[in-house]
Amino acid sequence: MKNRSVVIGISAIQQKGDFENLDEALALMDQAVKEALSDSGNKLVKDHIDEIRIPKGFWRYRDPGKWIAKNNDFKNIPTTYITKIGVLQQNLINEACLRIEKGEINASIILGGEARYKQLRSVIEKKEYFETQLDENPDFYIKAKEDLYGDEELAELGAMAVGYYATMETAIRKYDGEKIEEHQNKICLLYTSPSPRD
């Protein structure tokens, strides 16, 4: 191992409000990068970023990574990856860490963003939702090596993750010997406890 991979800047953005006060996913991702660079303590770190990895969202952009690099005046345009459905999000982090540790890259941005609430508000408020048009392809599209689920799982649980999460929570609850209400309260505590960063 040549280098040690560490997180040097993070950001998370959540918006609420009326349609006009909400941003599209591209603007949210751009703002998250700006805040993460600021959080790093040295905004010049942007000149050492060699790649940007983004899980494909519900948006239509082909390559938000290159747009964000240009919009933030990165010295070099990083290699961009868009990972499609079926690739675990943790894999983006794992790949970046591995490449840093091998000395293949200096730094990576792992980025994601959605504007589903703005899309919902557009329906409620009867407004038209537009996205910035980005037609340039990323350097790499990453697809899952195999299907995420088998035919039996698809028939019983569907294609949405919610069924799988419920199944995992049921298994955890059973393993811990908890009653349903007891397990629900435990999960509620997880989500209502203050964040370590607060």
How should these model regions be labeled?
Residues 49-55:
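Short glycine-rich phosphate-binding loop at a beta-alpha junction
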Residues 56-121, 125-150, 154, 158, ...:
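Conserved catalytic cysteine-centered active-site region
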Residues 191-198:
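Conserved small/polar residues in nucleotide/adenosyl-binding loops
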Residues 12-34, 56, 79-91:
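Active-site pocket-shaping loop/turn-to-helix segments
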Residues 31, 94, 162, 166-170:
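Residues on a specific face of well-ordered alpha-helices
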Residues 1-26, 139-158, 169-170, 174-182, ...:
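Condensing-enzyme catalytic core mediating Claisen C-C bond formation in acyl metabolism
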